[in-house]
């Protein structure tokens, strides 16, 4: 299936619109100036590429609930929608989705809230908490756009928005949606500036990528693209900019901040993009490089391009970061738009900043590559590539084409659960969880449940103590559950299979604890005194990066961020990757922590119970028991599982995702989206709702959440009540970890690993009736989850026969 681009929107340091920014870009106008938004007086570097301080944007009724990162994104999205002339109506909204990438999310709001807390807790507005997570961004966009399909965010740092483009293309080709609003956004923040200052990675002058390479210059902005199936675009008479062919996503498995010296991961992303596009290296006319301006990044990227494209005659390369700085999570989208404009106008933007002396030095490292120094170049461009690399060792490449091109059809593999790793309040193994289901709820401390991992666990899974100490708790529990998943699946990572295995990490709150810890250090000690030890752990994809480094897994590595259901969305994404043949095996993971910081934020919002008596489906208030953990589930193609002789716990039969926009921080009024997700999951699985035997639900004790869930089941199943099983009665509201655990619990039941007699809930007249059901004859189990803002995911697991 062809996927095409029909709309573009952008704001950055050299323009508030695509046209303004592009015209300045091709004319070599730099947006790098003295930083105005934060005080850098005590820092060694003072340059930045900031967007307009104030800009016109219609953000609707929730504008005051949005961080600058969302406002920048909404600005770009409004332009892209207008450019594409797409009309999102009640009739087509279910087939229109939103996927947005970001690195630091609502960092401005985090800084404000905790600065106010330092001055006195009564000054800190709890509403700022809703603006903080990356997960808020796509929800804000969906609300102003009216999109009701798949809605999520990608948290893979500086590769995030490139991955958002690739993920949306995958979903369109899988038939999940007709059109997507994709892109990325990040605002200028103390978090990023203080962090890169701590790493001494900033250039004190304007950055000079592929040239002096002394460091980066931070930028900010947003880029948005409307992408559609070709058939959908033609049917509405849309203007088509170009086709999106293939892409590649890889992991270095090397270092949390530094690229591999041999460029292997970067080359894998580029090679896989070429392979999935059915192109050879000689076909690429233009590459918009990642080109951050640091010595290691530039040298390894040049090495990678030389190895793949070095024999081409004059492949054009440039760094638009030389003008707009490094826009972090927005970089991929901004640079994709520049790449598309270059492709459609046959104009390569310049890489600015070369002196005559620099040009002489460039000849030695450029070889046959043309780095387009200082002046734009007009040339024929048929195929163009854009590359972005990130902390965590994540690499992403995507290829755009001026012309229609047939690419290899996707595979249609059956997908099975063949292993799992469980870290929660019951312990760190499948056996400890199974035993815990027999004894009931884990011990509650106040309103909390905690997962503990100690030295004996690290040793069991080959995690060295020196490595473990570098990790924040989120990464610690993810590494342990990931390693446990590989072991439980009987998988040994080798040079032969390391690129056949990947991972999708879902998280609601990500590394909030270390983000806050880093911010508090800046507040107390100054922007110039940030912790170089803590900063690398503030990116949402650090947990996946550390798991890759420790396990040696080098395949697809993506972090999804959209509330509690991110852990179940990870199952859907991983399912797609295996089903279409991109990877043989994928770990679908959900991870969230319960630290003092996390507890304080949920408690400030009034969500945490004080005594631990609150339980799902009690319908008494808005509070719940806060849990934590990490769940990793191995999804594997039928052919791979059979070749290995792997045990199959269950089959992933199908899934559905839907969204009904409500304000960030609530789900009240979003009921219909859960109905749609459940029905879509059943349809995808090839069954009717009547064939569902039981549900593993998401109720957590908040009466609004629980009532929406049960109301949906009553509408869908009517008098044919389905027993609802709950993992949150056992491990608390562990958010994304609980969502993935729901799928693991269903798989264990279908595989006969749990007792056939299971506690469950039935509902009558709005009340929950506790009962025990015999699960021995169950064939199909539905798993559901939710996210504040109105997103829902449903997955059907089927018994293996």
Q: Residue locations for each model-derived region?
A:
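Conserved beta-ketoacyl condensing-enzyme motif
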Residues: 5, 29-156, 185-193, 281-297, ...
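Glycine-/small-residue-rich "gating" segment that lines the acyl/pantetheine channel
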Residues: 34, 119-125, 166, 170, ...
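Flexible, low-complexity linker/loop segments at domain and module junctions
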Residues: 1-5, 88-93, 277-283, 312-313, ...
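Active-site-proximal alpha-helical scaffold in enzymes
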Residues: 73-85, 134-138, 142-145, 149-184, ...
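ACP-dependent fatty acid/polyketide chain-elongation machinery
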Residues: 1-62, 84, 231-241, 337-352, ...
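Acyl-CoA/ACP chain-elongation machinery
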Residues: 36, 176-214, 247-261, 286-298, ...
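Condensing-enzyme catalytic core mediating Claisen C-C bond formation in acyl metabolism
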Residues: 2-6, 29-34, 206-277, 286, ...
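Active-site pocket-shaping loop/turn-to-helix segments
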Residues: 13, 60-78, 124-133, 151-163, ...
């Amino acid at each position: 299936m062809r996927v095409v681009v029909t709309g573009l929107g952008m704001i950055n340091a050299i323009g508030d619109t695509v046209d303004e920014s592009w015209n300045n870009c091709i004319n070599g106008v730099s947006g790098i100036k003295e930083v105005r938004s934060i005080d850098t007086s005590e820092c060694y570097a003072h340059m930045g590429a900031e967007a307009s301080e104030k800009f016109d944007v219609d953000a609707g009724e929730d504008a005051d609930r949005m961080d600058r990162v969302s406002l920048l994104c909404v600005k770009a999205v409004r332009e892209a929608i207008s450019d594409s002339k797409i009309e999102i109506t009640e009739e087509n909204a279910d087939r229109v989705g939103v996927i947005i990438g970001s690195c630091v999310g609502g960092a401005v709001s985090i800084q404000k809230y905790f600065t106010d807390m330092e001055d006195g807790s009564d000054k800190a507005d709890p509403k700022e908490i809703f603006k903080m997570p990356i997960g808020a961004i796509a929800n804000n966009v969906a609300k102003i756009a009216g999109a009701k399909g798949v809605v999520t965010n990608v948290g893979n740092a500086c590769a995030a928005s490139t991955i958002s483009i690739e993920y949306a293309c995958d979903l369109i080709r899988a038939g999940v949606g007709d059109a997507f609003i994709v892109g990325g956004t990040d605002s200028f923040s103390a978090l990023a500036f203080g962090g890169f200052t701590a790493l001494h990675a900033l250039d004190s002058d304007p950055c000079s990528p592929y040239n002096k390479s002394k460091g980066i210059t931070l930028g900010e902005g947003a880029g948005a693209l409307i992408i559609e199936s070709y058939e959908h675009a033609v049917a509405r008479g849309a203007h088509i900019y170009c086709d999106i062919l293939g892409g590649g996503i890889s992991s270095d498995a090397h270092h949390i901040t530094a690229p591999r010296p041999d460029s292997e991961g970067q080359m894998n992303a580029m090679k896989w993009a070429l392979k999935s596009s059915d192109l050879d290296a000689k076909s690429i006319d233009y590459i918009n490089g990642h080109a951050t301006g640091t010595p290691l990044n530039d040298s390894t990227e040049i090495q990678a391009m030389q190895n793949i494209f070095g024999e081409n005659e004059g492949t054009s390369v440039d760094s638009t970061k030389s003008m707009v700085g490094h826009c972090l999570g927005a970089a991929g989208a901004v640079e994709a738009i520049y790449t598309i404009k270059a492709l459609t106008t046959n104009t390569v933007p310049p890489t600015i900043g070369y002196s005559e002396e620099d040009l002489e030095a460039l000849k030695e490292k450029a070889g046959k590559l043309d780095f387009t120094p200082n002046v734009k170049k007009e040339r024929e461009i048929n195929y163009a590539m854009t590359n972005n690399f990130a902390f965590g060792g994540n690499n992403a490449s995507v290829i755009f084409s001026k012309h229609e091109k047939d690419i290899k059809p996707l595979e249609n593999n059956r997908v099975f659960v063949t292993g799992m790793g469980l870290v929660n309040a019951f312990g760190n193994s499948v056996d400890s969880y199974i035993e815990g289901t027999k004894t009931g709820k884990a011990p509650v401390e106040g309103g909390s449940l905690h997962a503990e991992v100690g030295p004996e666990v690290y040793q069991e899974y080959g995690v060295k103590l020196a490595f473990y100490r570098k990790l924040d708790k989120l990464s610690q529990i993810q590494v342990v559950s990931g390693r446990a998943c590989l072991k439980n699946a009987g998988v040994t990572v080798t040079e032969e299979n390391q690129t056949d295995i990947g991972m999708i990490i879902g998280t609601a709150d990500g590394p909030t604890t270390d983000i806050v810890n880093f911010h508090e250090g800046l507040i107390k000690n100054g922007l110039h005194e940030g912790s170089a030890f803590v900063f690398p752990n503030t990116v949402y994809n650090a947990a996946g990066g550390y798991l890759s480094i420790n396990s040696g897994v080098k395949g697809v590595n993506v972090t999804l961020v959209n509330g509690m259901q991110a852990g179940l969305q990870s199952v859907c994404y991983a399912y797609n990757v295996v089903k279409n043949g991109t990877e043989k095996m994928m770990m679908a993971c959900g991870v969230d922590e319960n630290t003092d910081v996390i507890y304080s934020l949920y408690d400030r919002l009034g969500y945490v119970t004080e005594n631990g008596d609150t339980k799902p489906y009690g319908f008494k208030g808005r509070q719940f028991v806060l849990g934590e953990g990490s769940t990793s589930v191995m999804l594997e193609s039928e052919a791979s599982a059979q070749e290995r002789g792997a045990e199959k716990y269950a089959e992933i039969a199908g899934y559905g995702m839907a969204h009904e926009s409500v304000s960030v921080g609530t789900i009240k009024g979003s009921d219909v989206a859960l109905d749609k997700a459940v029905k879509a999951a059943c349809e995808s699985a090839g069954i009717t709702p009547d064939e569902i035997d039981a549900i593993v639900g998401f109720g957590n004790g908040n009466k609004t959440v629980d009532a929406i869930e049960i109301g949906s089941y009553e509408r869908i199943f009517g008098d044919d009540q389905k027993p609802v099983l709950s993992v949150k009665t056992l491990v608390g509201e562990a958010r994304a970890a609980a969502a993935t655990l729901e799928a693991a619990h269903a798989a264990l039941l279908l595989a006969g690993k749990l007792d056939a007699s299971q506690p469950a809930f039935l509902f009558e007249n709005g009340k929950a009736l506790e009962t025990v059901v015999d699960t021995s004859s169950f064939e199909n189990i539905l798993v559901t989850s939710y996210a504040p803002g109105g997103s829902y995911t449903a997955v059907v697991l089927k018994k293996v026969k």
